[in-house]
Amino acid sequence: MNFKRLYLLLVLFPLVLACTKGDDPGSSVPPPPTPVTPDPGGDSGETHPWDANRGKVVRPQNGNGWTVTKIDDGITYYAFEGTDAVSKAKQRVFVTETDLNNTSYSVKLAYYSDRNIASRVFSSTNAIAVMNGGYERGSIWLTMAGVNKATIANDYITSGDYKVPQWKSEAAIYMDNDRDVRIEYTGKDMTLAQWRTTYAAKAKTEKYLMTSAPMLIDDFEPVGETYTQRHPVQYPKCSEDPNVHQGSTTNPRTALAKTEDNHLLFVVVDGRRDNISRGISASELTQFLVNNFNPQYAINLDGGGSSTMCVAGQGDPNTHVVNYPCNNRNADYTITIGSETIVWPKETHGPDHLGERAVPTFFYVVKK
C-alpha cells in the first residue's frame, strides 16, 4: 500500500504544480507593450515644409520698398514698390489688412447685375476698402443672400477661335457678410459636373458663396506654386488657357487671403508696365504672400484690367483708387454701366488711377 501511495504522489505532484501555476493571476498578464513614438505627420504620416509656418505672424515693416499705414484700429494698408525678391522684377503691390476679430467692421460681397466700378462702390457704401471680385458670371458659382446669381453656366471659356474647358471654380469663398469669411479648396480634383453638384449643395446652407481659381494657399500648403504643373498648356496662343492665364504670362492680379490669426487680406498687384510693375504669375504671387504675410489660406480672383483697390484716405484724392488700372495705358478706354457710358482718357503723363473696368462683384469693408 505504501508503495502505491508513493507512486501516486510522484505522478500527481507535477500535475498539481502545473495547475497551481496556471491559476496564478500574474501568469496571464501579457508582457508590456513596446513603446510607440507618435507620428506628428498627420494622416499621411509625413511632415511638410509648410508646416513650419504654422503659428507664425508675418507682416512687412516700413522700409525695403514697403510703406505701412494705419487706416483705423484693426485696419492696416501696405504698399510695396520696388524689385520683388520672388519675381526679380519691378512690382507695385497693394494690400489692405482687416482684423476680423474686431467687431467694429463687416466684410461684404457685393453683386451688380449691370456691373460697377470700385470707386463708385467705395463712395456708395461708405467703405473703408474695396477690391474687385470674381471672374465673368458664366465661369463661377455665385450665391447672394441665399439666391443663386450664377451657376457655372459655361462648359467652355470662349476666346477668339478657342474654346477652353472651364477651369475657374476649383475653390470658393464662403461668407456671412459680417465677419465670417472662409476660403476653401472645395472643388479640388473635381470635374465640372461635380463642381456644379457640390456648389449647388453648398448653396443650400451658405448665405454668400463665390467660386474662383486657382487656390493659392490651402492650410499653409502653397498649392498655387504648382498650379501650372497640374494644368499643362493645351492652347499656347490662347490667353484663357489656364497654364497661359496663370503661368506663362504675367498679369495684374487680385487675391483674397486669410491669416491664422483671423486677419483678412485684400491683395492687388499692378502689371503690364515692365519698367514700373511687370505683373506676376500665380506661382510668384503665392510665394510673395507666403514670404510677406504667411496666410493660412489664399485664393486668386479676377485680375488683369479688372484689378482695382480703393482705400480710405489713400491714392487718388477723389476716388481713393490706390493702384494703377492698366486699361487706359495705350488708348482711351470706354466702359458701360447700365445705360451709362464712361470714357477713360489715355494716360498722358505715366500711370494714373483712371481706367477702372466695370465688373459685377466686389469685396468691401465697412464700419458698423
Regions found by a protein language model. Name each.
Residues 1-8:
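Bacterial N-terminal signal peptides that target proteins for export
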Residues 15-18:
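C-terminal motif of bacterial Sec signal peptides marking the signal peptidase cleavage site
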Residues 22-186:
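Zymogen propeptides
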Residues 126-128, 132, 296-299, 307:
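Alpha/propeptide regions of enzymes that mature by internal proteolysis
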Residues 140-165, 232-293, 297, 306-368:
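Conserved, well-ordered active-site substructure
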